[in-house]
């Protein structure tokens, strides 16, 4: 396909036009008084949101050159979302500011490669200063503040803090759509997996249709059990002790299942059989997790164990095992705590090493099941449009909270970025030429989030920026209450990871765009028209001949 090429200033200005169209759409959402953006959907109701990355993903521009610029900034938002889960609007705004100031200097004759060097030098200094002033968070109140600022809703912040308090920092917290109007928190303690009983005759509570066993033995195996003779020796040992049994196996069928059910109905022996969760290698890993949690040994031929020779000391135990039609929950397994910690560390290492998002998600689930439990935030609203918007805000707030727990917090409302300006200015003395220009570009860009938050609230951004710069570190502008306060004491905070990622990703893409000297796009070709339809069939000539 033929290409069209633009060079120099013309190419850069076309890219900048696309950057501005995307950034101007996104930046109106910044801050507590930021507005929403409505996005048309081909199917269903329009989406109303203030989530930067969601808005950016929807933008495709007609002009190919402008679209390239927009796609580059979209990458800033997407990368920040992937790394920190929030701060995408800030990242987009910083990218726009760096590109605007940078292109002015390139047009005036500055060398973009040297400017790029200055930009990276300044960003490194700013990030180092952010890390130095970062405060770690431990208390439930601090976690609630981070969530409340991100979602602009104190109730959401409190809900997330409650969830983290119950399942721990490594616990899984998921966000789901509720069928009711309210937003609620459901917590599942212990390990739960999505496999229920193999026969409804095994239930102990016929009203709730669930089997609840306290202090029962747990047999874990990767074998398919179809012959009762295989497990008869171990069953006899358990019956002698008068204990109940939970069997977790690849499958239990035929004679084996029928015998267990008949014995349960006769009152001879209480047992519930459950299929092992997962598939393939993931099933093996989950069986190992269950074994570690309950203190059992996985009875597997791969490990040299056979069901016929299994003994009671190979079985695990737990305070409670609850099995319903679809789920099995093991609470307070009696496994060795050190072995559980080692298993948790092993899974954390796998999470760090994996590149697959799907694998990462499944490993996170396993980690949560071993280390605490799962919390589900059920999001409710009056209409579907409000429900989608609220769900996106809660997901962002949850990501921001996790980031804050990981790397700590800094002053919010754009204050932290203004506070690191002196560290960037300190580099100016030892720099010269275009490298100095690159440092000054970052120095100016660091003001932009605070300026935009003020302007979205209908205030003069420059006045607010100058006042914050002349105040003590940590003093910022509380837009909602129209006063200057110590941001951290007032609970207006941002996660360090979010602020750092936004700046690093914005600088990375923007500096690359400044070094562009030509842009190449496909020439839009006219699509050939559809061929004409077939001619109509002629009518039948003459009438029927007379007999």
UniProtKB/Swiss-Prot annotation:
Its EC number is 5.6.1.7. GO terms for biological process: protein refolding. GO terms for cellular component: cytoplasm. CDD domains: GroEL. Keywords: ATP-binding, Chaperone, Cytoplasm, Isomerase, Nucleotide-binding. It catalyses: ATP + H2O + a folded polypeptide = ADP + phosphate + an unfolded polypeptide. GO terms for molecular function: ATP binding; ATP-dependent protein folding chaperone; isomerase activity; unfolded protein binding. The keyword Isomerase applies. ATP binds at residues 29-32, 86-90, 413, 478-480, 494. Pfam families: Cpn60_TCP1 (PF00118). It is found in: Cytoplasm. The keyword Ligase does not apply. Its main location: cytoplasm. It comes from the Bacteria. Forms a cylinder of 14 subunits composed of two heptameric rings stacked back-to-back. Interacts with the co-chaperonin GroES. Together with its co-chaperonin GroES, plays an essential role in assisting protein folding. The GroEL-GroES system forms a nano-cage that allows encapsulation of the non-native substrate proteins and provides a physical environment optimized to promote and accelerate protein folding. HAMAP family: CH60. Belongs to the chaperonin (HSP60) family. This is Chaperonin GroEL. It comes from Alkaliphilus metalliredigens (strain QYMF). The gene is groEL.
């Amino acid at each position: 396909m033929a290409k069209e090429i633009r060079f120099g200033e013309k190419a850069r200005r076309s890219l900048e036009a696309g950057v501005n169209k995307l950034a101007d759409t996104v930046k109106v959402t910044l801050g507590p008084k930021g507005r929403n953006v409505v996005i048309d959907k081909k199917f269903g109701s329009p989406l109303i949101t203030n989530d930067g990355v969601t808005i950016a993903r929807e933008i495709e521009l007609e002009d190919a050159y402008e679209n390239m610029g927009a796609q580059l900034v979209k990458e800033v938002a997407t990368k920040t979302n992937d790394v920190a889960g929030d701060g995408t609007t800030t990242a987009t705004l910083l990218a726009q500011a760096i590109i605007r100031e940078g292109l002015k200097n390139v047009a005036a004759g500055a060398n973009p490669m040297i400017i790029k060097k200055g930009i990276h030098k300044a960003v490194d200094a700013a990030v180092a200063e952010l890390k130095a002033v970062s405060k770690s968070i431990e208390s439930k109140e601090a976690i609630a503040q981070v969530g409340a600022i991100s979602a602009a809703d104190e109730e959401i912040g409190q809900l997330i803090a409650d969830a983290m308090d119950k399942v721990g920092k490594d616990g899984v917290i998921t966000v789901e759509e509720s069928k009711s109007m309210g937003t609620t928190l459901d917590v599942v303690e212990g390990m739960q997996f999505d496999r229920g009983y193999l026969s409804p005759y095994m239930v102990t509570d016929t009203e709730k249709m669930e089997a609840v066993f306290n202090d029962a033995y747990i047999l874990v195996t990767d074998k398919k059990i179809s012959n009762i003779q295989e497990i008869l020796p171990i069953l006899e040992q358990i019956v002698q002790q008068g204990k109940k049994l939970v069997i977790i196996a690849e499958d239990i069928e035929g004679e084996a299942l029928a015998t267990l059910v008949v014995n349960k109905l006769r009152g001879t022996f209480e047992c519930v059989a459950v299929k092992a969760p997962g598939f393939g290698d993931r099933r093996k890993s989950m069986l190992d997790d269950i074994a570690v949690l309950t203190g059992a040994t996985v009875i597997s031929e791969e490990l040299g164990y056979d069901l016929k020779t299994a003994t009671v000391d190979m079985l695990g135990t737990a305070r409670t095992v609850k099995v319903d039609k679809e789920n099995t929950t093991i609470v307070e397994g009696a496994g060795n705590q050190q072995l559980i910690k080692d298993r948790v560390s092993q899974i954390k290492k796998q999470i760090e090493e994996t590149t697959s998002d799907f694998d990462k998600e499944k490993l996170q689930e396993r980690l949560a099941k071993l280390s605490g439990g799962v919390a589900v935030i059920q999001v409710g609203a009056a209409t579907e449009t409000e429900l989608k918007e609220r769900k996106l805000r809660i997901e962002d707030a949850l990501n921001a909270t996790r980031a804050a727990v990981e790397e700590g917090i800094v002053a919010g409302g754009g204050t932290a970025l203004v506070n690191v300006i002196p560290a960037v200015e300190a580099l100016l003395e030892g720099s010269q030429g275009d490298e100095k220009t690159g440092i000054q570009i970052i120095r100016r860009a660091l003001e932009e989030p605070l300026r935009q938050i003020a302007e979205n609230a209908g205030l003069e951004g420059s006045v607010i920026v100058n006042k914050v710069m002349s105040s003590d570190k940590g003093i910022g502008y509380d837009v909602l209450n129209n006063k200057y306060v110590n941001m951290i004491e007032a609970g207006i905070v941002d996660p360090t990871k979010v602020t750092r990622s936004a700046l690093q990703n914005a600088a990375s893409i923007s500096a690359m765009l400044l070094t562009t000297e030509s842009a190449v796009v496909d020439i839009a070709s006219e699509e050939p028209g559809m061929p004409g339809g077939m001619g109509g069939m002629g009518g039948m000539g003459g009438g029927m001949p007379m007999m």
